[in-house]
Amino acid sequence: MIQFNEFTLDNGLRVIVHEDPTVQIAVLNVLYDVGSRDERPDKTGFAHLFEHLMFGGSINIPSYDEPLQKVGGENNAFTNTDITNYYLTVPAANIETGFWLESDRMLSLSFDPQVLEVQRKVVIEEFKQRYLNQPYGDVWLRLRPLTYLKHPYQWATIGKEVSHIENATPEDVRDFFFRFYAPNNAIMVVAGNVTTEQVKKLITEVL
C-alpha cells in the first residue's frame, strides 16, 4: 500500500504527499474539481479551453513552459467531464520552481486577449480535426444527447459546438476562472524525493 500524508491549508487547498527517497525526481499534480459537467449548456467547451489557457502565462510569468524547462521539468494536462488535471515533473532539487509556477497561475492567471485568441484557434482546430473532419467523427457528439437526456454529460469535453468557443468573450473566461480556479476547489499531490515538512514550508510560502 502506498503511504502518504495529508493536510489542508487555511485557504482550503487539500495536499497529499508521498515521500520516496529512492528517486531523484518529484511530481506535482493539481486537480481542479471542474469539468465539462460544470459548463452552461450555451457555453460549452470552457473547461477544455482553460486547460489550454493555463499554459498561456500569468501576470508575473509571460510563459509557463520556459522557467519549467530551464530547471529540467516537463508538464502536461487533461480535461474530462468531472475534473481538470495539471501535472509536472522536475528534478527534486527544483521542486520549489514547480510550487511557484502552479501557485502563480492559480492566483494570477493572465487574461491577455492575445492568449485567448491563440488558444481559441488551437481548440477550434482540435475540435475540427477530431470530430468534424473525420468520417463519422461527430458520432460521439450525436450519441451523448441520446444517452444523457438532461445530465451535462450530454456534451463532449471539447464542447457541444464550435460556436461556443468562437463566441467566448474575455468576460466569459474571467467568470469561469473565478468560479472554479481557487485553492478550495483543488487537490495538490506531491510525490518523489520530498518530505512532508518541506512541502508544507514551500506551499505555505506561495499559497
Q: What residues fall within each predicted segment?
A:
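N- or domain-start disorder-to-order transition segments that initiate the globular core
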Residues: 1-24
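Residues embedded in well-ordered beta-strands
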Residues: 14-16, 29, 85, 187
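M16/MPP (pitrilysin/insulinase) zinc-metallopeptidase core fold and M16-derived inactive scaffolds
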Residues: 27-89, 155-158
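His/Glu-based metal-binding/catalytic segments typifying zinc-dependent metallopeptidases
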Residues: 20, 29-31, 145
